[in-house]
From Swiss-Prot:
A GO cellular component annotation in the UniProt record: cytoplasm
Gene: mraZ
Record-annotated SpoVT-AbrB domain positions: 5-52, 81-124
UniProt cross-references to PROSITE patterns, sorted A to Z: SPOVT_ABRB
Organism: Pseudomonas putida (strain W619)
Lineage: Bacteria, Pseudomonadati, Pseudomonadota, Gammaproteobacteria, Pseudomonadales
Subcellular location: Cytoplasm, Nucleoid
Subunit-level organization: Forms oligomers.
Keywords, in A-Z order: Cytoplasm, DNA-binding, Repeat, Transcription, Transcription regulation
The protein's name: Transcriptional regulator MraZ
Length: 151
């Protein structure tokens, strides 16, 4: 399980180092093999361990292909997916096209989302995080089933 928000830096080639606390799990689960694709809702990237991505692909494959919404989602997620592997230093290269989509430059945030990571531009992450917190703190903004989750 991946949790926490981690400040990371992209080098001039677009590589970033996976925080060391995740490397052992990624190595044992998927030999450091990752899939990076766009997030179809937010202006960030999704980074999946290969085993998690294979489950997503199976779900996408099972969708009825006659529905335009399904084909659209498949095109976006699968069409932008890139196979990557952690190198010996625990780094991976984010392709230019995906860096452009998420407006990634030097400072970024790698945010654990249980089964995957989101990779955000640092300023965009700070803005969306503040907006999310403000929205959820509004009276009546949180449904009862979600309120029950909060300890």
């Amino acid at each position: 399980m991946f949790r926490g928000a981690n400040a990371v830096s992209l080098d001039a080639k677009g590589r970033l180092a996976m925080p060391s606390r995740y490397r052992d799990e990624l190595d044992s689960r998927c030999n450091g093999q990752l899939i990076v694709t766009i997030d179809a809702v937010d202006p960030c990237l999704c980074v999946y361990p290969l085993d998690e991505w294979e489950q997503i692909e199976a779900k996408l494959r099972a969708l009825p292909s006659l529905r335009e919404e399904n084909r659209r989602l498949q095109r976006l997620l699968i069409g932008n997916a890139v196979d990557l592997e952690l190198d010996g230093s625990g780094r991976f290269l984010v392709p230019p096209r995906l860096r452009e989509y998420a407006k990634l430059d030097k400072k970024a945030m790698l945010v654990g989302q249980l089964n995957k990571f989101q990779l955000w531009d640092e300023d965009a992450w700070n803005a969306v995080s503040a907006a999310d917190l403000a929205a959820i703190q509004q009276p009546g903004a949180m449904p009862d089933d979600l309120r029950d989750l909060i300890l």
